[in-house]
């Protein structure tokens, strides 16, 4: 679907220069002299490159709609991750680099993820916002340490390092944000 250059919004996926780009940031500029334009920061969906582009209101840009499908994570072997389509039971394999080394460490057997694809080709993956993990190692609580925002380092069951409150001990299950590995709360 073609849209005008001034209709580009952050999050839009565009076909520009024969490549898929996502609009990260848009600034609409109305100079005193000349026509209005949109200054758009684009990120390449395939290799992560960034590009700043200027679109006039009259410019036409191809807006792409990505297919989003639920997949279940099955297992990891070497540098490949195997997922199964929840509806057709068809399996796909993606390289760990495609997902990202740190993000791949949050994947657990049976976890549901959303795979975004364009023309049957996977181009992105969305993990759940939060996952439940066990604290594998952390420092013991120091009595009398009552600072309001004191966190201590911890290593989680998936090997990721995080900061947890002083009351969290080894073996406890906590909920962690997959975006940055930060502590959210204790698991029930």
UniProtKB/Swiss-Prot annotation:
Taxonomic classification: Bacteria, Pseudomonadati, Pseudomonadota, Alphaproteobacteria, Maricaulales
SUPFAM superfamilies on file: Nucleic acid-binding proteins, Translation proteins SH3-like domain
Family per similarity comment: Belongs to the elongation factor P family.
GO BP terms: peptide biosynthetic process
Alphabetized UniProt keyword annotations: Cytoplasm, Elongation factor, Protein biosynthesis
GO MF assignments: translation elongation factor activity
Pathway participation: Protein biosynthesis; polypeptide chain elongation
Disulfide pattern: none
Family annotation (InterPro entries): Elong-fact-P_C (IPR015365), NA-bd_OB-fold (IPR012340), Rib_uL2_dom2 (IPR014722), Transl_elong_fac_P/YeiP (IPR020599), Transl_elong_KOW-like (IPR013185), Transl_elong_P/YeiP_cen (IPR001059), Transl_elongation_fac_P (IPR011768), Translation_prot_SH3-like_sf (IPR008991)
Job of this protein: Involved in peptide bond synthesis. Stimulates efficient translation and peptide-bond synthesis on native or reconstituted 70S ribosomes in vitro. Probably functions indirectly by altering the affinity of the ribosome for aminoacyl-tRNA, thus increasing their reactivity as acceptors for peptidyl transferase.
Protein name: Elongation factor P
Superkingdom of the organism of origin: Bacteria
Cell location: Cytoplasm
PANTHER family the record matches: ELONGATION FACTOR P (PTHR30053), TRANSLATION ELONGATION FACTOR KOW-LIKE DOMAIN-CONTAINING PROTEIN (PTHR30053:SF14)
One GO cellular component term noted in the UniProt record for this chain: cytoplasm
